Every structure is written in C-alpha cells, then in structure tokens.
Design a protein with these regions (language model features):
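Acidic, proline/glycine-enriched N-terminal capping motif
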Residues: 1-93, 101-103, 332
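Short amphipathic beta-strand starts and helix->beta connectors
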Residues: 43-49, 95-105, 191-200, 381-384
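Short, charge-rich binding segments
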Residues: 84-86, 95-101, 106-112, 134, ...
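Conserved, structured C-terminal
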Residues: 1-35, 112-464
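Internal amphipathic helical hairpin motif
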Residues: 68-102, 165-195
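Generic hydrophobic, aliphatic-rich segments that mediate packing or membrane embedding
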Residues: 61, 69-74, 89-91, 102-107, ...
C-alpha cells in the first residue's frame, strides 16, 4: 500500500525513530557549485583572512508570501516580535509547534508592503504554506524549490554573500562607490553593472558583509562583477565542501529536526504533508538513540534562540513557551575535541577490523540531522549536532546542546562517535565500531572575532 501523506507513513511503520535513522538519505547537498574551487583549507582561510563569495543560489528553497494578511500570518507563526518589522528589514524567523518545540529557522525578508520572502530549509516553508492555504487568510504563497529538486536549472533569484575582513572593500569596488550605511539585518538597493541588486547586511564570518540577491537573469553579470572586484583583495570562491563547515565557526546549528512527528494538534498538518517530502525522507544519524522521537526535539533556548522569543503577540506555541521560560534550559555550546582522540579514531582506517565511523573533512556530517551522545562520567548531558574540522583553528569541533550544569566552558565531556550495533542502513554508513572522543565545552561562536561581533558595541549594533 502506498502512503498518501506523512501521517499514513508514520502509522505504517513500527517506529518513527527507526524510520528516520534508516532513511536512505545522506547530508544536505550543495548543488550548483564545485566541491572545491581551490581547496577547502584555502577557502576556509579566506573567510577569516581576506574575503569569500558564498554562492547560495542553489541549495536553499524560497517561499514568497504576499497579500494583506501576510504579516498577520507570519506573526501568528513566529516566536519573534513583529512590532518593529518594517520594510527593508530581515530576521531569523523561528516557528514552534503548540508544545513549544522548534520546527526550524529561516531568514525572513520584508521586501515591500505586503511582500515577504522566506529563505532556508523546507520544514518552515512547508509550515507557513500549510497555514496560508488552510487558515482562511487573504494572501498567496509561491514556492521556488531548491536546485536539487528541479530539472530546469533556473531559480527565481540568485543569492551571493560576500564575507570576511575585506568584504566591504569588494562591495565598494563592485558598486564603484562607498556602500550606504546599513545596520545589521537591514536591506538596501544598489546598482552593479547597470542592474539593481538588493542587499542584506549580514556577517557569517564575524565581519560585516553583504548578501546580494536579484532576478535570476542578472546572475552572470553580478557574479562576474563581484569576482572581478575581489581580485585585488584576495577573494576566494567557496565550494560545497568548505561551505558545509562554516557553521562550526559561526555557531549556527543548521539541523534541528522539525518537531512535527507527534501530537494530536498536528495530525491535520501531517495529513497535509506528502509521504515522500522532506519530513518523510529526513535522516537522523549518530550515537544518540531514543525510542521516543520527541527526545530529538529542541526548544528555542536549546538552539540559542531564547532571546528571540517575545511574548508581545499571540503565536502558536506561546502558552507552552511561557511555561518553559523560567525553567532551567540546555545551552548551545562548542565542543573542542581532543586532538589525540580524533587522530586515534582516524587511524583506525588503517586497521583491517574494528574501524571507527569514517570522519570526513571538513564536514563529518553524514545525515540530515546529526545526533551524537555527549556524556560526563557515563551520564548523558546532551547531544552533538554538527561535526567537522576548521583549518583556521586547527581543530575538530562540534556544535552541541548541553544541560546547564555541564555547559560551562572548560567542562570536560565525552562524545560517542558512530552508531550502535555496527551502524544503520543509511547509504552513508559503513560497518564500524563506536569510539569515545574527549572534548572540552567551549564558547559559541568558537572563533573570537565572530564572538566579539555579537557584543553590544560591535558592528552588528551600528550602521557601518
């Protein structure tokens, strides 16, 4: 029997967790760009030392949200405040379930009156589309699917980020003039090679930079102009391998599992979702195993989004989050892994037997949603969610969510690397044995220059 929707699919399997852990899908892919332009070490070096161009035109989906009720719907779904969300502003948009667990996060752009754009992974876009289509709102939505799910090779928009210490020098050269002053997550319009571009003030590398986007027809001239402008400043183009690792330095967790697999209030949503969509195909990987899929859910505080939760409006999940607000929360941290333990784990690749799970470079992520067990003296204290190597710091790092008593920098923990029982049936998993790797709880973001950019008096708080 073919399942018509996600709810039917979940009812057809003995275990939701087993279904997700054995899904035949690897990590998120980054189509449209080479794996490497020079090499991933050089490209990582660029975002800390010169400047880089991230080509984001292919791997993220976009949802246009337009109409008189667009703001009303978005405010109803997001934990964020919308009191000051004027045209030409953007924000990290975080919707939750009625039980207060995160569905995902995307960037929300306010492009014009009654016109918005959501950019990121599918779960949030699906959630917004469902409510737009079923809630009786006076509005429209239109999905522009990511390139991996297209056959025409075209998108509605190109999207380029110029980041790093010399990012604004490159922007000035491409514009032919000094860029206008712009606050963090604010938008402006500018002209490059005779075409109008929209620009968002952003800073993934801890330095002020711009994210530029516009009609797909302008992809080539804008891209060429940025590359030419960057030659003097050592601009690196970033390929898919290095791009997948930049979250380790910036401290953003890309991979919360959408918390929609349980709950009677969400049954109609699961019946709306297709069986073969993102939620029905997503893969979980790692050493953390629980029979209850809700143990894989995150709250906003777990992901470092507690400061975004504002109780100044009515939104789905508000009552649950109000109950949680004063509780002890888990904390997002970086784990700096023990060099010798990592080296010993990698060295098992030269053994005929008892090999560890392969650690790829620079990103060791092998599923869409990584969950590795983190312990102290054998007791579970959290999960690791993103794993990889930064050449800039000469360190293997993970982004983790840790119980408050053990989240203080300097705390020694142990990460269990690899899956139990020799591994699941995911195509990215080979037979292996689990290995313990020691780590030290460290700040997030791990890189000092990125961490300093979040200070109250940093460039993020000023028009620069």
């Amino acid at each position: 029997m073919t399942q018509r929707n996600l709810e039917e699919l979940l009812r057809s399997v003995p275990s939701t967790v087993d279904m997700l852990r054995n899904a035949q899908v690897g990590p998120n892919v980054y189509p449209g760009v080479p794996a490497e332009y020079t090499n991933w070490r050089d490209e990582q070096w660029g975002w800390q030392n010169t400047c880089v161009l991230y080509n984001q035109s292919f791997h993220m989906a976009e949802l246009a949200v337009e109409g008189p009720d667009a703001m009303t719907l978005l405010s109803r779904l997001g934990v964020n405040t919308f009191g000051n969300f004027d045209v030409d502003r953007a924000k990290q948009f975080v919707p939750c379930t009625p039980d207060g667990y995160v569905i995902g996060d995307v960037i929300l752009f306010h492009l014009a009156e009654e016109e918005f754009n959501l950019v990121g992974r599918a779960p949030v876009l699906n959630w917004v589309t469902y409510h737009a289509q079923t809630g009786g709102y006076d509005m429209q939505v239109a999905l522009d699917q990511r390139s991996a799910l297209r056959t025409d090779g075209r998108r509605k928009h190109y999207r380029f980020q110029v980041q790093g210490p010399h990012a604004m020098d490159v922007i000035a050269r491409a514009l032919g003039t000094q860029p206008p002053e712009l606050r963090f997550f604010n938008l402006t319009s500018a002209e490059i090679e005779g075409v109008t571009v929209r620009a968002l003030r952003h800073g993934m590398a801890g330095q002020p930079g711009w994210e530029l986007f516009g009609p797909w027809e302008d992809y080539e001239p804008v891209h060429a102009a940025l590359v030419a402008a960057g030659q003097e400043f050592g601009l690196r183009l970033v390929g898919g391998r290095a791009y997948s690792s930049n979250a380790l330095e910036s401290g953003w967790i890309p991979s919360p599992l959408p918390a929609i697999y349980t709950g009677d209030e969400l049954r109609s949503y699961r019946e709306w979702l297709p069986a073969n969509g993102y939620e029905g195909s997503a893969s979980i990987g790692g050493s953390f195993v629980s029979a209850d899929v809700e143990d894989y859910y995150f709250t906003p505080w777990d992901l470092g989004y507690g400061h975004l939760v504002k109780f100044d409006h009515d939104f789905i999940g508000r009552e649950a989050l109000e109950r949680m607000a004063d509780d002890e929360h888990r904390h997002k941290v970086t784990l700096a892994l023990h060099d010798d333990d990592v080296a010993d784990t990698i060295a098992t690749m030269f053994h005929k037997t008892d090999r560890a799970k392969f650690i790829d470079w620079p990103s060791a992520v092998y599923s869409m949603h990584p969950f590795d067990l983190v312990t102290v003296n054998g007791d579970t204290v959290g999960v690791s969610t993103w794993f990889g190597y930064t050449s800039n710091e000469a360190k293997m790092l993970t982004l983790a969510v840790i119980n408050e008593p053990h989240a203080k920098p300097g705390t020694e923990v142990t990460l269990l690397w690899g899956e139990e029982g020799g591994g699941t049936s995911k195509p990215t998993v080979e037979p292996h044995v689990q290995r313990e790797i020691r780590g030290v709880v460290s700040p997030v973001p791990y890189v000092e220059v990125v961490r300093q950019s979040y200070a109250p008096d940093s460039w993020r708080s000023a028009a620069v």
